UniProtKB/Swiss-Prot annotation:
Protein name: Transcription termination/antitermination protein NusG
Pfam families (alphabetical): NusG
Alphabetized CDD domains for the sequence: NGN_Bact_1 (cd09891)
UniProt superkingdom: Bacteria
Lineage, opening ranks: Bacteria, Bacillati, Mycoplasmatota, Mycoplasmoidales, Mycoplasmoidaceae
Gene behind this protein: nusG
Alphabetical list of HAMAP family matching this protein: NusG
Biological role: Participates in transcription elongation, termination and antitermination.
Record keywords, A-Z: Transcription, Transcription antitermination, Transcription regulation, Transcription termination
GO biological process: DNA-templated transcription termination; regulation of DNA-templated transcription elongation; transcription antitermination; transcription elongation-coupled chromatin remodeling
NCBIfam families per the UniProt record, alphabetical: NusG_myco (TIGR01956)
GO CC annotation terms, alphabetical: cytosol
Length: 316
């Protein structure tokens, strides 16, 4: 066999199911069979996209969730507007993945018979062999695997299964979304009619949107007591065992909740707004309240609220 035939080449393979699942499972299969030297790498090429949506205090609509996640970020723009950034990633080739391998009958058999892979480009027809990428495209792919995009306006993030390309003016060196200064200082239009989310001023938002009775209920149930930097007084905080009546359909039932510091809980701010948080402290005596750390938009807050506003997080 000639030396050129022992050099791994990049091939393109169409997939019929989720691309990254195929890549992950194929890598595991290659490892299990000991074919790492023949099938060198498998990757999907993706592009990260951003969808921005501004929520306004004037609309009166509150989002169901205020939680920051990897692909969902909240930012405070000003006293009235809040920015939701939804991040998504799509396959730049559609339903195709890249496979780097030294072609052999065995390697080809592993790839073409793998669940989710429907062939390799160029291999259709009796006796046809797969066609590798041309030198230019292969070199571009190798450059991206070094974290360098062929487009100077793009940034590259590498994972075990993917090469992810993104705009460098939207994501920093740590691949975090960049909030533009002009977004933060832009004032809302008087006729703006979008939706609302709040961070530091969540309480004020509720006051403006609810009637006076609901305002009093909110004020009683949950008030922001201090920032995350403020220290709690441990002398008044101890683990607590509470027993409360809760409404289950049309019947009142008693349910025992045993909360401890460190528990991950669901915080019921209103009937429709629930966020997850972690118990940082529990009050001594008959106060029956907890200090819970929650994340609203890009801010972390400690709130003080009754234990009946908490429930344990249910994991599927």
């Amino acid at each position: 066999m000639q030396a050129s035939e022992l050099t791994p080449k990049w091939y393109v393979a169409p997939v019929s199911i989720k691309d990254e699942a195929v890549v992950k499972n194929l890598k595991a299969k290659i490892q299990a069979l000991g074919f790492n030297h023949e099938i060198v790498d498998v990757k999907v090429l993706k592009e990260r996209e951003v969808h921005e949506e501004v929520y306004s205090l004037k609309s009166g609509k509150l989002p169901r969730s205020l939680k920051n996640t990897t692909f969902n970020k909240w930012f405070v723009l000003d006293d009235y507007r809040y920015l939701r950034v939804k991040i998504s990633e799509k396959n730049l080739l559609g339903r195709y993945i890249y496979i780097k391998m030294i072609y052999s009958e065995d390697a080809w058999r592993i790839v073409r018979n793998f669940p989710g892979i429907t062939g390799i480009v160029g291999s259709s027809g009796r006796g046809a062999l797969p066609i590798p990428l041309d030198e230019k495209d292969a070199n571009n792919l190798e450059q991206m695997l070094k974290g360098i995009s062929i487009n100077p306006s793009k940034r590259i993030m590498l994972t075990n299964t993917a090469i992810i390309e993104m705009d460098s003016d939207k994501f920093d060196e740590k691949f975090q979304y960049i909030l533009k200064q002009k977004q933060a200082i832009q004032k809302p239009k008087e006729d703006e009619d979008s939706e609302i989310v709040d961070a530091e001023k969540l309480k004020e938002a509720f006051k403006k949107l609810q009637n006076s009775q609901e305002q009093d209920e909110w004020k009683e149930k949950a008030t922001i007591i201090q920032s995350e930097q403020t220290k709690l007084d441990p002398s008044v905080l101890v683990p607590f065992l509470g027993k409360y009546e809760i409404l289950d359909t049309d019947n009142k039932v008693e349910q025992l909740f045993e909360f401890s510091v460190g528990n991950l809980v669901e915080v019921h701010l209103t009937d429709t707004i629930h966020v997850q948080g972690q118990i940082k402290a529990l009050y001594q005596g008959t106060v029956n309240k907890a200090v819970v750390e929650i994340e609203l938009t890009s801010k972390t807050q400690l709130i003080n609220l009754p234990l009946e506003n908490l429930s344990f997080v249910e994991f599927e």
